[in-house]
Amino acid sequence: MRFMDLLFTFPGILLAMLIVAMLGVSTVNATIAISVWSIPNFARMTRGKVLQIKEEDYIMAIRSLGARDTRILLCHVLVNALPVIIVIATMRMASSIMSIATLSYLGLGSPPPTPEWGGMISIAKDYMWDRPSLIIIPGVVVMITVICFNILGDKLRDILDPSLKD
């Protein structure tokens, strides 16, 4: 967990830029950079949920019945932690899309023939006054996609988290 805390100390986009600069400019390397940046969030939230589930009474009851640790982990802990992981994944997807668009806008995403929203905005900034639609349309599409993923994450949290139900 200390390594995850170390990753939390770096600003996410700077860490992604550093990784892409070391590995080279490509879609795969940008995806790796965003994944490395996202892992600490998953690790911290999953660890917290697992520690919470581990202290539940039914886990102690199952353990007293003689269940093995792998069975407890797979059948009870993972099943109860999965909703949190799914919600984090959908919420994190929105920020990952923004980060990929930012990296490609800065020239650290896919090479120019590959269509990326950030790359489209970067190229269109030269023609902003003549053809504003070239910059507005990719920006609006990024915004709508991010909002949709955030709404999806909110709805999944409402559906999957039993503590929020009245």
Language model segments and positions:
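Membrane-embedded alpha-helices of multi-pass transport/permease systems
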Residues: N29, I39-V50, K54-D57, R71, ...
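Glycine-rich helix-loop "coupling/hinge" segments at transmembrane-helix boundaries
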Residues: I19-G24, I34, V50, M98-V141
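Hydrophobic alpha-helical transmembrane segments in multi-pass membrane proteins
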Residues: T9-M17, V79, P83-I100, S104, ...
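Residues that define the loop-to-transmembrane-helix transition and helix capping
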Residues: P11, T27-V28, T70, S133, ...
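C-terminal transmembrane helix and the adjacent membrane-cytosol boundary/short C-terminal tail
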Residues: L23, V36-W37, P83-M91, P132-D166
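Generic hydrophobic transmembrane alpha-helix motif, especially the helices
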Residues: M1-Q52, I86
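Amphipathic cytosolic juxtamembrane alpha-helices at the membrane-cytosol interface
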Residues: M1, L51-E55, I59-V87
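A short glycine-centered flexible hinge/capping loop motif at secondary-structure junctions
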Residues: L65-A67, G107, P111-P113, P162-S163
